[in-house]
Amino acid sequence: TTTDVHPPLYYVIMHVWQSIFDNSVASLRGFSVTCGVLTIALLFLLLQKLFSKRIAVFGSFLAALGPFLIRYSDEARMYALAALLAVAMTYTFIVAVEHKNKKFWWALYGILVTLGLYTQYFLALILPAHFVYIWLKLGGNRTAIKNIFKDKNVWLAAGTCFLLFLPWLPVMISQTSRVSGGFWIPEVTKFTIPATLSMFLTYDDRIVRYFGLLLPPIIVVISFILAKKHPKYQAAIWILTIWLLLPMIIVYTLSQGRPVYLDRYFTYSAPAFYGLIAVFIG
């Protein structure tokens, strides 16, 4: 895929998948469907670990019915795989934080992050959500930041990811330069992010007509209120909120210079959206 703008993992998997099954449309879409089902199962485990079984049942139910995940779980592209890896990365990270002396989980986390980067570069944008989670768990202060950077397990995960992704780094840089030379993606507007959130909910951006620019702030305000009301769950609430919104905000900002924002690029944020809705309602 060096002549494409996407990383290679999905294409490698598809090559193997076709050799085992066939190259029919149903077969190719079957892989994405499998990823979608596994995403819902892993989201259940993640929400159960972060909150409760009730929230997990509700959140995974919403995800199973979520039109955005359904749409891209039926398409022969890498977005369903990206969503699966985003949930897998986050779940493994939570377990690694809980078992901080278990190097296996930190190494596995580093491997999953690498697989995520080999699937969709923008998956790196959920890593700040992981950082905020461990920062809050360690006290949410300057000492916590120092402790994070002193943690050998954190460096184990980072080193694993760096070494495994290093061979592809020159290709990624080359792909980035080609995109900067001009591409077909439309320009962003002030309604771009609200429209994406609306698509998560109904796969129709018309809800923006009712909520407009207020949709992202509403999510942040509710998250803030719930985090203050339930300190036990503040890290869990913020990891979902940042996972949902920060990638969109970063890519939106980058798109002021040259457009790189498309709704489907954030399929991996959809599980966080459905999880948050479950938390807000539950």
Feature map (PLM): residue ranges:
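Membrane-proximal helix-loop-helix interfaces that form the catalytic/acceptor-binding platform
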Residues: 1-282
